[in-house]
Swiss-Prot record:
Residues 428-435 are annotated as: G1. Residues 453-457 are annotated as: G2. This is Translation initiation factor IF-2. GO terms for molecular function: GTP binding; GTPase activity; translation initiation factor activity. The gene is infB. InterPro entries: EF-G-like_DII (IPR053905), IF2_II (IPR044145), IF2_N (IPR006847), P-loop_NTPase (IPR027417), Small_GTP-bd (IPR005225), T_Tr_GTP-bd_dom (IPR000795), TF_IF2_bacterial-like (IPR000178), TIF_IF2 (IPR015760). Keywords: Cytoplasm, GTP-binding, Initiation factor, Nucleotide-binding, Protein biosynthesis.
Length: 918
């Protein structure tokens, strides 16, 4: 059996949770609130304890729930919704039907009618009325025979009953006029032995439906809440054909004659209603007489409502007039008024705890007329402070938007310094084994997920060696990612230079050495791939000595470790060297100050928004901290470590991925945590404004000096490109690589570059600009793809940067106008000429060199001078048109639009050949 909570046990044994908690705590059980759980033994103990209490104490009678009427303001007894009417019980005899009786018989008779005892001294006119089914005249009680036709004696009895009812109705009306308030509240009480529901006012209400010509009397006993303020009126029949009545009606709700026992039988014949009996008739248009007796009470209710409204209004007015005006306590003046440049009266009033009107009055007496929003100069502020007898001190303004200065100040903080893990950057040439080394260190498979085996983004990871943490940054090795690698060198403490033993020093190896030296970062050389055939570690050492990296074995200070990342050889030795170098550097940070650090990578996620991978360099970052990163700001919503788990804080040298920024920062931006969100927002907005102004300043305006260059650029063709990538570093790298492509006569024009998937806005821009969209590790959305198909926009998707660069270069070369050069293909000597009308001069000749074609261009040369240049009109051999005549054959030809051909002329045939762009 499972554990049970306190509130569940309280419901089962009908005891409040508070009592159970007090009892459990008194017995030494470990419970705190109603959600605490109990084992089986504790539950059994508490059940027995409260069972004994309930058997020894007398059961408390259930109190009738009361509520305060929203209309009259009086407390009335709340009724239950529906009484249970059971027509199967036997008929019980009425007990104590005396007018002065205070008990009520709540037993149900067999016909479903309930007898109600009158408690206000009125005659009890309730009667048991038959419950006849619709369209049926048979008696539901089978043991009662139908009554025969009335005799004269019964007629006399009925007449006397009607007379008695009329007299009773008249008496009740007189009583109601004298005491209209007597019927406001009716209390019901039951005998101790009777079972009844508390707070119910059972009423016998007739349900008279005239259907199919039969006058069927149906009694529907519905107990409804007794609302004091309802107007007493007999409403038309509802769907259930029950008339609701309230306590604001006269005491004789249904003044029916006290019929003898013979009248309780169900008569199958027609049954007449007494005109003056005051019964509730549910037929439409009924109750012509019974409803008139309620009119005095309706008037009285309206008067009562008016009196109540007037009393409430008078009470509110009285409270307003008697309200005491609180006197504001005057706060003491501060010792020093600290003001800033351009402070106004309203701000001074807040600082010295005085009203602005008082300060304006003082300034007016000094001859200075200002309002509370006007700025005051420093002299006026000092005079005002002297008048109040306090010292004025100008506040030193700090530029909170200069986060670089704040970052440097945080780095210089030398209090509460503790050791921190080293940050290690792995650098090297393409395919020299950087990612494989990190893969071996982390026991994961990063390389398999990289496109083409090349690391396309920057990653940050932590691992533990000898109970000490080491943070690794994996910067990509391709030359296009120079900026990313430079940013990685700025945040690192130690650089591991991976060099393949079979390849030696390569261009990116030299570049990595220069970055590390520029950042004053110590270098540990890892000579990789020593397991391969042809590996020569000594040759690598000789090459690196040219760049100042001399091994310790050769008398230098550079650590060299020969490893095999693939086999895991000497990996532990490399980690030991890293920890040894970290001890020499004495890396420390203050975890108690506000966090500061750098952005490793940033991207826009469709589900999470702006995401930034950051490295905390100083202080401790917490979830919820207000932060400014570059030109963006926000409050940290989530922090995720390299394993994808959420963390609440990040200590120095810890890489985390954060969300909650208002934009995507640039990779390499610095960040600073502020004390409050207001300051962070102000700093972020100010930095964004300054960046926008600098961008506008960088825009090139046409001057006389650069006018010619601008015109020359206008002659050049351009390739409009839109770049979308997964991370900011990839966007920058791809843009720089494309702009470095050199094709004479064509230039790259990047009209838009951003992080994220290719969307409809990008396609719209490309369609308007006739641009090509290049997606790097991203895909277009379904809507964007559909729009691109309809707009004929070219979208090129790539995962490797080489392919993207080559494709754009090919497109640039294809945009140049084709270059043609002339090629001489043949020569014809003219030996005979014929003049034919309608055709012109026909020349007969012999092909001496090459060949001549029908579509080739020709030149007519006479005595070494070109006389005419044009096209062939026709080319024939004998009488047949031919396309080509080769060397050694005779031919006949005509020159288009030229007839001055003479014997001895030479016709040179040529064609224009397209030269490919280099």
């Amino acid at each position: 059996m499972g554990k049970k909570r306190i509130y569940e046990l309280a419901k089962e044994i009908n005891v409040s949770s508070k009592d159970i908690i007090e009892k459990a705590q008194a017995d030494g059980l470990d419970v705190k609130n109603h959600m605490s759980t109990l084992d089986d033994a504790s539950e059994k103990h508490l059940r027995n304890a409260f069972k004994k209490n309930t058997t020894t104490t007398k059961p408390e009678e259930k109190r009738t729930p009361k509520f305060r009427s929203s209309k009259t303001g009086k407390t009335v007894v709340k009724k239950s919704d529906h009484p249970a009417a059971d027509g199967t019980k036997g008929i019980q005899r009425l007990k104590s039907s005396n007018n002065e009786s205070t008990t009520r018989n709540n037993n149900n008779n067999k016909n479903g009618n309930q007898n109600r005892n009158n408690t206000n001294g009125r005659p009890n006119n309730n009667q048991n009325r038959p419950n006849n089914n619709r369209n049926q005249n048979n008696n539901r009680n089978g043991n009662r025979p139908n009554q025969p036709k009335r005799d004269e004696k019964q007629d006399r009895i009925r007449a006397s009953v009607a007379e008695a009812a009329r007299m009773a109705a008249q008496a009740n009306r007189e009583i109601a006029n004298e005491k209209p308030q007597a019927n406001r509240q009716r209390t019901n009480s039951a005998k101790p032995g009777e079972q009844r529901r508390e707070g119910r006012n059972n009423q016998n209400r007739p349900n008279n439906n005239n259907r199919n010509g039969n006058n069927v009397n149906r009694t529907n006993n519905n107990n409804r809440p007794n609302n004091n303020n309802r107007n007493n009126e007999n409403r038309p029949s509802r769907p259930n054909n029950t008339n609701q009545t309230t306590n604001n009606r006269p005491a004789n709700n249904t003044t029916r004659p006290a019929a003898p026992a013979a009248t309780t039988a169900n008569n199958s014949g027609e049954k007449k209603q007494d005109r003056f009996s005051g019964r509730n008739n549910n037929s439409r248009g009924g109750n012509r007489f019974g409803n008139n007796q309620n009119r005095p009470f309706n008037k009285e209710n309206r008067k009562n409502k008016k009196r109540n409204r007037k009393a409430k209004r008078d009470g509110r007015m009285k409270e307003t007039t008697n309200k005491v005006v609180t006197v504001r306590k005057e706060r003491p003046l501060p010792d020093v008024l600290e003001y800033s440049e351009g402070i106004n009266v309203a701000e001074i009033a807040k600082k010295i705890h005085r009203e602005p009107a008082e300060i304006i009055k003082k300034l007016f007496m000094m001859g200075v007329m200002v309002n509370q929003n006007q700025s005051l100069d420093n002299d006026t502020v000092e005079l005002l402070a002297a008048d109040y007898g306090i010292e004025a001190q100008q506040k030193v303004e700090v530029d909170i938007s200069d986060i670089d200065k704040i970052f440097e100040d945080e780095e210089k903080n030398t209090t509460n310094l503790v050791s921190r893990p080293p940050v290690v950057t792995i650098m090297g040439h393409v395919d020299h084994g950087k990612t494989t080394l990190l893969d071996k260190l982390r026991h994961s498979h990063i390389t398999e997920g990289e496109a083409g085996g090349i690391t396309q983004g920057i990653g940050a990871y932590q691992l533990k060696h000898d109970d000490k943490l080491i943070t690794f940054l994996d910067t990509p090795g391709h030359a296009a990612f120079t900026e990313m690698r430079a940013r990685g060198a700025d945040v690192t403490d130690i650089t591991i230079l991976v060099v393949a033993a079979d390849d030696g020093v390569m261009p990116q190896t030299i570049e990595a050495i220069n970055h590390a030296k520029a950042a004053n970062v110590p270098i540990i050389v890892a000579v990789n791939k020593i397991d391969k055939q042809g590996a020569n570690p000594n040759h690598v050492m000789e090459q690196l000595t040219e760049y100042g990296l001399i091994p310790e074995s050769w008398g230098g200070d550079t650590i060299f470790v020969e490893i095999s990342a693939k086999l895991g050889q000497n990996i532990d030795e490399l980690l030991d060297m890293i920890l040894l170098q970290a001890e020499v550097l004495e890396l420390k940070a203050n975890p108690d100050q506000n966090a500061a650090g750098s952005v490793i990578e940033a991207q826009l996620d469709p589900g999470k928004g702006s995401i930034a991978t950051i490295l905390v360099q100083q202080g401790t970052m917490h979830v919820g901290d207000p932060i400014v990163i570059g030109n963006t700001f926000g409050r940290i919503r989530t922090m995720v470590n390299e394993h994808g788990r959420r963390v609440k804080e990040a200590t120095p040298s810890t890489p985390v991925e954060i969300t909650g920024l208002n934009g995507v920062p640039e990779a390499g931006d610095r960040f600073v945590v502020f004390d409050d969100e207001k300051s962070a927002r102000a700093a972020g907005e100010e930095r964004a404004k300054r960046a926008q102004m600098e961008e506008r300043k960088r825009s090139n305006h046409v001057t006389l000096d650069n006018l010619f260059d601008s015109l020359k650029e206008g002659e050049m063709k351009k390739v409009d490109i839109i770049i979308k990538a997964d991370v900011q570093g990839s966007v920058e790298a791809l843009a720089d690589s494309l702009q470095k492509i050199e094709v004479e006569g064509v230039r790259v024009n990047i009209i838009h570059k951003a992080v994220g998937a290719i969307n409809e806005s990008d396609v719209t821009l490309a369609a308007a600009s006739n641009a090509i969209i290049i997606g790097f590790n991203v895909r277009p959305t379904a809507q964007a793809k559909q729009m691109a198909d309809s707009e004929d926009v070219d979208i090129r998707l790539h995962r490797v940067i080489y392919n993207a660069i080559d494709e754009v270069e090919s497109a640039m070369k294809g945009m140049l106008e084709p270059v043609y050069e002339e090629e001489i293909i043949g020569q014809v000597d003219i030996r005979e000429t014929y003049k034919v009308s309608r055709v012109g001069t026909i020349a007969g000749g012999f092909v001496t060199e090459g060949f001549i074609t029908r579509d080739s261009g020709v030149r007519l040369i006479r005595d070494g001078v070109v006389i005419y240049e044009g096209k062939l009109g026709s080319l024939k051999r004998f009488k047949d048109d031919v396309k080509e005549v080769k060397r050694g054959f005779e031919l006949g030809l005509t020159v288009e639009n030229y007839n001055d051909i003479k014997i001895g002329d030479v016709i040179e045939a040529y064609r224009m050949k397209e030269v490919p762009v280099e």
